Protein backbone atom coordinates (compact mmCIF):
# COMPACT_ATOMS: atom_id res chain seq x y z
CA UNK A 1 0.00 0.00 0.00
CA UNK A 2 1.36 3.44 -0.92
CA UNK A 3 2.02 5.96 1.88
CA UNK A 4 1.11 9.61 1.42
CA UNK A 5 3.17 12.48 2.91
CA UNK A 6 1.42 15.37 4.67
CA UNK A 7 2.90 17.73 2.04
CA UNK A 8 1.08 15.77 -0.70
CA UNK A 9 -2.24 15.75 1.18
CA UNK A 10 -2.13 19.53 1.91
CA UNK A 11 -4.00 21.72 -0.62
CA UNK A 12 -3.12 25.19 0.75
CA UNK A 13 0.69 24.77 0.83
CA UNK A 14 1.21 25.71 4.51
CA UNK A 15 2.57 22.25 5.54
CA UNK A 16 5.18 21.98 2.80
CA UNK A 17 8.70 20.94 3.86
CA UNK A 18 11.64 20.84 1.45
CA UNK A 19 13.18 17.52 0.49
CA UNK A 20 16.89 16.82 0.46
CA UNK A 21 18.48 17.54 -2.93
CA UNK A 22 20.63 14.67 -4.16
CA UNK A 23 23.72 15.87 -6.04
CA UNK A 24 24.16 14.17 -9.41
CA UNK A 25 27.46 12.39 -10.09
CA UNK A 26 29.96 14.31 -12.23
CA UNK A 27 31.10 12.85 -15.52
CA UNK A 28 34.88 12.32 -15.57
CA UNK A 29 36.32 12.56 -19.12
CA UNK A 30 38.64 9.86 -20.40
CA UNK A 31 42.38 10.44 -20.60
CA UNK A 32 43.62 11.64 -23.99
CA UNK A 33 45.87 9.18 -25.79
CA UNK A 34 47.72 10.50 -28.86
CA UNK A 35 47.65 8.46 -32.05
CA UNK A 36 50.75 6.62 -33.17
CA UNK A 37 52.50 7.29 -36.48
CA UNK A 38 53.83 10.34 -38.30
CA UNK A 39 51.87 13.26 -39.78
CA UNK A 40 51.95 13.76 -43.54
CA UNK A 41 52.67 17.50 -43.87
CA UNK A 42 52.40 17.55 -47.66
CA UNK A 43 49.46 19.52 -49.11
CA UNK A 44 47.89 19.75 -52.55
CA UNK A 45 48.96 23.42 -52.69
CA UNK A 46 52.63 22.51 -52.32
CA UNK A 47 52.26 19.75 -54.91
CA UNK A 48 50.32 21.73 -57.58
CA UNK A 49 51.82 25.21 -57.08
CA UNK A 50 54.00 26.45 -59.95
CA UNK A 51 56.25 29.40 -59.04
CA UNK A 52 56.47 32.31 -61.46
CA UNK A 53 59.29 34.75 -62.00
CA UNK A 54 58.39 38.16 -60.59
CA UNK A 55 59.68 41.27 -62.33
CA UNK A 56 60.26 44.56 -60.46
CA UNK A 57 57.62 47.23 -60.91
CA UNK A 58 58.35 50.35 -62.93
CA UNK A 59 57.79 53.57 -61.00
CA UNK A 60 55.07 55.79 -62.47
CA UNK A 61 55.83 58.71 -60.15
CA UNK A 62 57.42 61.64 -62.03
CA UNK A 63 60.84 62.97 -61.11
CA UNK A 64 60.71 65.52 -58.33
CA UNK A 65 61.55 69.01 -59.52
CA UNK A 66 62.81 71.45 -56.96
CA UNK A 67 61.82 75.08 -57.17
CA UNK A 68 64.77 77.47 -57.29
CA UNK A 69 64.04 80.77 -55.56
CA UNK A 70 65.92 83.95 -56.32
CA UNK A 71 67.45 86.00 -53.57
CA UNK A 72 69.48 85.26 -50.49
CA UNK A 73 67.84 82.94 -47.92
CA UNK A 74 68.26 83.73 -44.24
CA UNK A 75 68.89 80.30 -42.69
CA UNK A 76 70.03 81.46 -39.26
CA UNK A 77 67.41 80.32 -36.68
CA UNK A 78 66.77 81.90 -33.30
CA UNK A 79 68.55 78.97 -31.65
CA UNK A 80 71.87 79.88 -33.34
CA UNK A 81 71.43 83.54 -32.41
CA UNK A 82 70.80 82.79 -28.72
CA UNK A 83 73.05 79.71 -28.35
CA UNK A 84 76.54 80.26 -26.94
CA UNK A 85 78.87 77.52 -28.14
CA UNK A 86 81.77 76.26 -26.06
CA UNK A 87 85.31 75.94 -27.26
CA UNK A 88 85.42 72.13 -27.54
CA UNK A 89 88.52 70.36 -28.81
CA UNK A 90 88.15 67.29 -30.99
CA UNK A 91 89.10 64.03 -29.27
CA UNK A 92 91.23 61.47 -31.04
CA UNK A 93 89.85 57.94 -31.38
CA UNK A 94 91.46 55.31 -29.16
CA UNK A 95 90.21 52.49 -31.39
CA UNK A 96 92.80 51.25 -33.91
CA UNK A 97 91.82 50.96 -37.56
CA UNK A 98 91.49 47.32 -38.65
CA UNK A 99 90.23 45.78 -41.90
CA UNK A 100 87.79 42.86 -41.63
CA UNK A 101 88.64 39.73 -43.69
CA UNK A 102 85.83 37.16 -43.90
CA UNK A 103 86.87 33.49 -43.48
CA UNK A 104 87.22 31.35 -46.62
CA UNK A 105 86.24 28.05 -44.92
CA UNK A 106 82.56 27.04 -44.87
CA UNK A 107 80.72 27.33 -41.53
CA UNK A 108 80.53 23.76 -40.26
CA UNK A 109 78.19 23.99 -37.26
CA UNK A 110 74.79 22.47 -38.06
CA UNK A 111 71.50 23.38 -36.34
CA UNK A 112 69.23 21.09 -34.29
CA UNK A 113 66.65 21.24 -37.09
CA UNK A 114 69.20 19.97 -39.65
CA UNK A 115 70.30 17.18 -37.28
CA UNK A 116 66.77 15.98 -36.33
CA UNK A 117 64.92 16.62 -39.61
CA UNK A 118 64.62 13.66 -41.98
CA UNK A 119 63.14 14.56 -45.38
CA UNK A 120 60.29 12.30 -46.45
CA UNK A 121 58.88 11.69 -49.87
CA UNK A 122 55.44 13.26 -50.40
CA UNK A 123 52.93 10.71 -51.68
CA UNK A 124 50.08 12.07 -53.81
CA UNK A 125 46.63 11.62 -52.28
CA UNK A 126 43.97 9.54 -53.96
CA UNK A 127 41.40 11.76 -55.69
CA UNK A 128 37.74 10.85 -55.09
CA UNK A 129 36.43 13.53 -57.46
CA UNK A 130 34.07 12.10 -60.13
CA UNK A 131 35.01 12.27 -63.77
CA UNK A 132 34.02 15.53 -65.48
CA UNK A 133 33.22 13.83 -68.84
CA UNK A 134 29.54 14.30 -69.74
CA UNK A 135 27.78 11.17 -71.01
CA UNK A 136 25.57 12.03 -73.96
CA UNK A 137 22.39 9.97 -74.45
CA UNK A 138 21.67 8.43 -77.85
CA UNK A 139 17.85 8.52 -77.81
CA UNK A 140 15.63 11.65 -78.05
CA UNK A 141 14.78 13.65 -74.92
CA UNK A 142 11.51 12.61 -73.25
CA UNK A 143 9.97 15.82 -71.89
CA UNK A 144 6.74 14.21 -70.57
CA UNK A 145 6.39 14.55 -66.78
CA UNK A 146 4.16 12.60 -64.43
CA UNK A 147 1.98 15.71 -64.01
CA UNK A 148 1.40 15.99 -67.77
CA UNK A 149 0.58 12.27 -68.10
CA UNK A 150 -1.79 12.06 -65.11
CA UNK A 151 -3.48 15.46 -65.47
CA UNK A 152 -7.16 15.32 -66.53
CA UNK A 153 -8.63 18.68 -67.70
CA UNK A 154 -12.07 19.56 -66.28
CA UNK A 155 -14.57 22.03 -67.63
CA UNK A 156 -15.08 25.07 -65.39
CA UNK A 157 -18.56 26.04 -64.28
CA UNK A 158 -20.04 29.43 -65.08
CA UNK A 159 -19.24 31.87 -62.25
CA UNK A 160 -22.30 33.25 -60.49
CA UNK A 161 -22.49 37.05 -60.76
CA UNK A 162 -24.26 38.67 -57.83
CA UNK A 163 -26.32 41.76 -58.85
CA UNK A 164 -25.23 45.04 -57.28
CA UNK A 165 -27.60 46.37 -54.62
CA UNK A 166 -28.94 49.89 -55.07
CA UNK A 167 -28.60 52.14 -52.03
CA UNK A 168 -31.92 53.55 -50.81
CA UNK A 169 -31.70 56.28 -48.17
CA UNK A 170 -34.19 56.14 -45.26
CA UNK A 171 -36.90 58.75 -44.79
CA UNK A 172 -36.74 58.67 -40.97
CA UNK A 173 -34.54 61.24 -39.16
CA UNK A 174 -31.22 60.13 -37.59
CA UNK A 175 -31.41 59.32 -33.87
CA UNK A 176 -28.22 60.55 -32.16
CA UNK A 177 -29.33 59.46 -28.68
CA UNK A 178 -26.78 57.01 -27.20
CA UNK A 179 -27.25 54.54 -24.34
CA UNK A 180 -24.95 56.66 -22.17
CA UNK A 181 -27.08 59.78 -22.68
CA UNK A 182 -30.26 57.78 -22.21
CA UNK A 183 -29.22 55.96 -18.98
CA UNK A 184 -26.85 58.52 -17.39
CA UNK A 185 -28.37 60.84 -14.82
CA UNK A 186 -25.96 63.55 -13.72
CA UNK A 187 -25.72 64.87 -10.18
CA UNK A 188 -26.48 68.50 -9.44
CA UNK A 189 -23.51 70.43 -8.03
CA UNK A 190 -22.10 73.87 -7.57
CA UNK A 191 -20.10 75.52 -10.32
CA UNK A 192 -16.34 75.69 -9.79
CA UNK A 193 -14.97 79.00 -8.60
CA UNK A 194 -12.16 80.71 -10.46
CA UNK A 195 -8.99 80.80 -8.32
CA UNK A 196 -7.13 83.14 -10.66
CA UNK A 197 -6.53 86.58 -9.07
CA UNK A 198 -8.09 89.64 -10.60
CA UNK A 199 -5.99 91.48 -13.16
CA UNK A 200 -4.85 94.86 -11.89
CA UNK A 201 -2.92 97.12 -14.19
CA UNK A 202 0.06 98.84 -12.59
CA UNK A 203 0.89 102.29 -13.94
CA UNK A 204 4.05 104.12 -12.93
CA UNK A 205 5.03 107.66 -13.79
CA UNK A 206 8.51 107.32 -12.25
CA UNK A 207 11.49 107.58 -14.60
CA UNK A 208 13.17 104.21 -15.42
CA UNK A 209 16.45 103.60 -13.59
CA UNK A 210 19.19 101.93 -15.60
CA UNK A 211 20.93 100.39 -12.56
CA UNK A 212 20.25 96.78 -11.57
CA UNK A 213 20.76 94.76 -8.41
CA UNK A 214 23.80 93.06 -10.00
CA UNK A 215 25.43 96.44 -10.78
CA UNK A 216 24.77 97.72 -7.24
CA UNK A 217 26.15 94.54 -5.58
CA UNK A 218 29.23 94.10 -7.81
CA UNK A 219 31.15 97.35 -8.21
CA UNK A 220 34.27 97.43 -10.44
CA UNK A 221 37.61 97.25 -8.65
CA UNK A 222 41.13 98.08 -9.71
CA UNK A 223 43.21 95.19 -11.11
CA UNK A 224 46.91 95.27 -10.13
CA UNK A 225 49.46 94.88 -12.96
CA UNK A 226 50.97 91.39 -13.41
CA UNK A 227 54.30 90.67 -11.74
CA UNK A 228 57.30 90.29 -14.05
CA UNK A 229 59.71 87.51 -13.09
CA UNK A 230 63.36 88.58 -13.08
CA UNK A 231 65.64 86.29 -15.10
CA UNK A 232 69.02 85.52 -13.54
CA UNK A 233 72.06 86.67 -15.51
CA UNK A 234 73.91 83.90 -17.35
CA UNK A 235 77.31 83.08 -15.79
CA UNK A 236 79.53 80.72 -17.86
CA UNK A 237 81.23 77.89 -15.91
CA UNK A 238 84.91 78.21 -15.05
CA UNK A 239 87.53 75.70 -16.19
CA UNK A 240 87.79 73.36 -19.17
CA UNK A 241 85.24 70.65 -20.00
CA UNK A 242 86.24 67.03 -19.38
CA UNK A 243 85.36 65.04 -22.49
CA UNK A 244 86.56 61.64 -21.22
CA UNK A 245 83.62 59.22 -20.90
CA UNK A 246 83.43 55.73 -19.38
CA UNK A 247 83.55 54.28 -22.91
CA UNK A 248 86.87 56.05 -23.68
CA UNK A 249 88.43 55.08 -20.35
CA UNK A 250 87.24 51.43 -20.20
CA UNK A 251 87.44 50.63 -23.96
CA UNK A 252 89.49 47.53 -24.86
CA UNK A 253 90.44 47.38 -28.59
CA UNK A 254 89.78 44.15 -30.50
CA UNK A 255 91.31 42.97 -33.76
CA UNK A 256 88.40 42.88 -36.21
CA UNK A 257 88.06 43.65 -39.89
CA UNK A 258 85.47 45.94 -41.47
CA UNK A 259 82.27 44.38 -42.84
CA UNK A 260 81.85 44.49 -46.63
CA UNK A 261 78.59 46.14 -47.72
CA UNK A 262 76.06 43.74 -49.31
CA UNK A 263 73.93 46.52 -50.78
CA UNK A 264 73.41 46.03 -54.55
CA UNK A 265 74.74 48.53 -57.05
CA UNK A 266 72.13 51.13 -57.99
CA UNK A 267 71.31 51.42 -61.69
CA UNK A 268 70.42 55.01 -62.46
CA UNK A 269 68.94 56.22 -65.71
CA UNK A 270 71.38 58.34 -67.68
CA UNK A 271 69.88 61.01 -69.92
CA UNK A 272 71.78 63.35 -72.26
CA UNK A 273 69.15 66.11 -72.51
CA UNK A 274 69.25 68.92 -69.91
CA UNK A 275 66.89 68.88 -66.91
CA UNK A 276 63.72 70.94 -67.32
CA UNK A 277 62.54 72.20 -63.94
CA UNK A 278 59.19 73.52 -65.21
CA UNK A 279 55.71 72.11 -64.78
CA UNK A 280 52.18 73.18 -65.64
CA UNK A 281 51.58 74.14 -62.02
CA UNK A 282 54.67 76.38 -61.90
CA UNK A 283 53.78 78.08 -65.19
CA UNK A 284 50.11 78.68 -64.25
CA UNK A 285 50.77 79.60 -60.62
CA UNK A 286 53.80 81.93 -60.40
CA UNK A 287 55.12 83.06 -57.04
CA UNK A 288 53.38 86.10 -55.59
CA UNK A 289 55.09 88.97 -53.89
CA UNK A 290 54.57 88.64 -50.16
CA UNK A 291 53.20 91.78 -48.58
CA UNK A 292 51.58 92.40 -45.24
CA UNK A 293 47.80 92.44 -45.34
CA UNK A 294 46.15 95.55 -44.02
CA UNK A 295 43.74 95.61 -41.11
CA UNK A 296 40.18 94.79 -42.15
CA UNK A 297 37.89 97.08 -40.18
CA UNK A 298 34.19 97.32 -40.84
CA UNK A 299 32.54 100.69 -41.03
CA UNK A 300 30.32 101.60 -38.12
CA UNK A 301 26.70 101.41 -39.26
CA UNK A 302 25.05 102.64 -36.04
CA UNK A 303 26.12 106.17 -35.05
CA UNK A 304 27.24 106.83 -31.50
CA UNK A 305 24.55 108.32 -29.22
CA UNK A 306 24.76 111.98 -28.33
CA UNK A 307 23.27 113.56 -25.24
CA UNK A 308 21.99 112.17 -21.96
CA UNK A 309 20.45 108.67 -21.72
CA UNK A 310 16.66 108.92 -21.38
CA UNK A 311 16.10 105.33 -20.22
CA UNK A 312 13.20 104.86 -22.72
CA UNK A 313 13.22 101.74 -24.93
CA UNK A 314 11.63 101.33 -28.36
CA UNK A 315 9.05 98.95 -26.89
CA UNK A 316 7.93 101.53 -24.32
CA UNK A 317 7.89 104.37 -26.83
CA UNK A 318 5.80 102.43 -29.42
CA UNK A 319 3.58 100.57 -26.93
CA UNK A 320 -0.12 101.47 -27.07
CA UNK A 321 -2.15 100.24 -24.05
CA UNK A 322 -5.50 98.59 -24.81
CA UNK A 323 -8.42 97.88 -22.54
CA UNK A 324 -8.74 94.22 -21.53
CA UNK A 325 -11.92 92.62 -22.87
CA UNK A 326 -12.95 89.40 -21.03
CA UNK A 327 -13.35 86.32 -23.24
CA UNK A 328 -16.89 85.03 -23.67
CA UNK A 329 -17.33 81.59 -22.12
CA UNK A 330 -18.73 78.90 -24.46
CA UNK A 331 -18.93 76.25 -21.74
CA UNK A 332 -22.39 74.58 -21.54
CA UNK A 333 -24.49 75.00 -18.42
CA UNK A 334 -23.89 72.44 -15.68
CA UNK A 335 -27.46 71.13 -15.40
CA UNK A 336 -28.24 67.57 -14.41
CA UNK A 337 -30.38 65.40 -16.70
CA UNK A 338 -33.35 64.18 -14.69
CA UNK A 339 -35.19 60.95 -15.48
CA UNK A 340 -38.35 59.54 -13.88
CA UNK A 341 -37.34 55.90 -14.57
CA UNK A 342 -35.37 54.28 -11.67
CA UNK A 343 -31.79 53.09 -12.32
CA UNK A 344 -31.51 49.43 -13.34
CA UNK A 345 -28.50 48.26 -11.26
CA UNK A 346 -28.77 44.56 -12.25
CA UNK A 347 -25.56 43.31 -13.98
CA UNK A 348 -24.62 40.08 -15.76
CA UNK A 349 -22.14 39.27 -12.97
CA UNK A 350 -24.80 39.48 -10.22
CA UNK A 351 -27.19 37.26 -12.24
CA UNK A 352 -24.70 34.52 -13.21
CA UNK A 353 -22.53 34.55 -10.02
CA UNK A 354 -22.65 31.25 -8.10
CA UNK A 355 -21.01 31.30 -4.65
CA UNK A 356 -18.65 28.41 -3.99
CA UNK A 357 -18.31 26.57 -0.70
CA UNK A 358 -15.02 27.26 1.12
CA UNK A 359 -13.06 24.04 1.40
CA UNK A 360 -11.03 23.17 4.50
CA UNK A 361 -7.49 21.87 3.97
CA UNK A 362 -7.29 18.20 5.13
CA UNK A 363 -3.78 18.82 6.54
CA UNK A 364 -5.21 21.26 9.13
CA UNK A 365 -6.72 18.35 11.10
CA UNK A 366 -4.56 16.44 13.63
CA UNK A 367 -5.39 13.31 11.64
CA UNK A 368 -6.61 13.93 8.04
CA UNK A 369 -10.00 12.31 7.38
CA UNK A 370 -9.71 9.14 5.33
CA UNK A 371 -6.01 8.55 6.31
CA UNK A 372 -4.26 6.60 9.11
CA UNK A 373 -0.91 7.78 10.56
CA UNK A 374 2.00 5.44 9.76
CA UNK A 375 5.37 6.98 10.80
CA UNK A 376 7.65 10.06 10.70
CA UNK A 377 10.99 10.05 8.85
CA UNK A 378 14.28 11.73 9.89
CA UNK A 379 13.43 14.98 8.06
CA UNK A 380 10.13 15.46 9.96
CA UNK A 381 7.74 14.37 7.17
CA UNK A 382 4.61 12.60 8.41
CA UNK A 383 3.34 9.70 6.28
CA UNK A 384 -0.28 8.49 6.26
CA UNK A 385 -1.99 5.46 4.73
CA UNK A 386 -5.24 5.88 2.82
CA UNK A 387 -8.26 3.99 4.20
CA UNK A 388 -9.89 1.74 1.61
CA UNK A 389 -13.68 1.55 2.06
CA UNK A 390 -15.03 -1.93 2.70
CA UNK A 391 -16.90 -3.57 -0.18
CA UNK A 392 -20.19 -5.21 0.77
CA UNK A 393 -20.64 -8.79 -0.37
CA UNK A 394 -23.66 -9.68 -2.45
From Swiss-Prot:
Region (Mn 4) residue spans: 278-292
Residue span of region Mn 6: 346-360
Signal peptide coordinates: none
Residues covered by region (Mn 5): 312-324
Region of interest (Mn 2), residue spans: 144-158
GO molecular function: microtubule binding
InterPro entries attached to this UniProt entry: SAXO1/2 (IPR033336)
Cellular component aspect of the GO annotation: nucleus
Region (Mn 3): 244-256
Segments of this protein annotated with the region Mn 1: 110-122
Family the entry assigns: Belongs to the FAM154 family.
Protein name per UniProt: Stabilizer of axonemal microtubules 2
Amino acid sequence: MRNWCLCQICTCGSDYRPYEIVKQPRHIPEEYKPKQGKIDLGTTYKRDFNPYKVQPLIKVRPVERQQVKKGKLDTVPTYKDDYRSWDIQKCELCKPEQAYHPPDVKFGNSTTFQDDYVPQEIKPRQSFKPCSVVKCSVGPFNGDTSHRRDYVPHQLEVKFARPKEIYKPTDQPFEDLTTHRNDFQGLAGETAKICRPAYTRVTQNIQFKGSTEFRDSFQPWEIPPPKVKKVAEYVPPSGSMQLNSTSHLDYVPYQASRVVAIRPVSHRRQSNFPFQGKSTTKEDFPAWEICRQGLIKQQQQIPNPSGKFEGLSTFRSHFVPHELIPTESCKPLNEALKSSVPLDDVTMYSIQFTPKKQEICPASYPSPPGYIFENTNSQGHKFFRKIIPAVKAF
